[in-house]
Design a protein with these regions (language model features):
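ATP-binding N-terminal substructure of ATP-dependent carboxylate-amine bond-forming enzymes
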Residues: 1-93
Length: 93
C-alpha cells in the first residue's frame, strides 16, 4: 500500500480553498490502495498532521480549519515516511 501525503492550507489568501480541496482529495482517495496522511499548513506556516478522520467528516466549508492537529516539529524527517507527496497549495499573494 502506497503512503501518500496530501499537503494543504498555507499562507496564501486562498488558504481556505486549499483546505477544502485538500480535504476533498483525502476523502476521495481509495483507502484500499493508499494510506493517506493529511498534512495541514496554518496561515503562519506551521505544519501539522491532521488527526481527524477527514474521510468520515462532513465537507469542510470555506473558513473552517481541521480541529484535531499534531504539530510536525521536523517536516523533512516526517516526510521520509511518505512515498508520494500531493501538494494542494497556492502561492503566497
Amino acid at each position: 500500500m502506497l503512503k501518500i501525503g496530501i499537503i494543504f492550507g498555507g499562507k496564501s489568501n486562498e488558504h481556505s480553498i486549499s483546505v477544502v480541496s485538500g480535504c476533498s482529495i483525502v476523502k476521495n482517495l481509495n483507502k484500499l490502495k493508499y494510506e493517506v496522511l493529511a498534512i495541514y499548513i496554518d496561515k503562519n506556516g506551521t505544519w501539522y498532521e491532521v488527526l481527524d478522520d477527514i474521510a468520515n467528516m462532513p465537507n469542510y466549508k470555506l473558513g473552517e480549519e481541521p480541529i484535531n492537529l499534531k504539530k510536525i516539529e521536523n517536516i523533512i524527517e516526517y516526510l521520509k515516511q511518505v512515498e508520494i507527496i500531493f501538494p494542494v497549495l497556492r502561492w503566497k499573494d
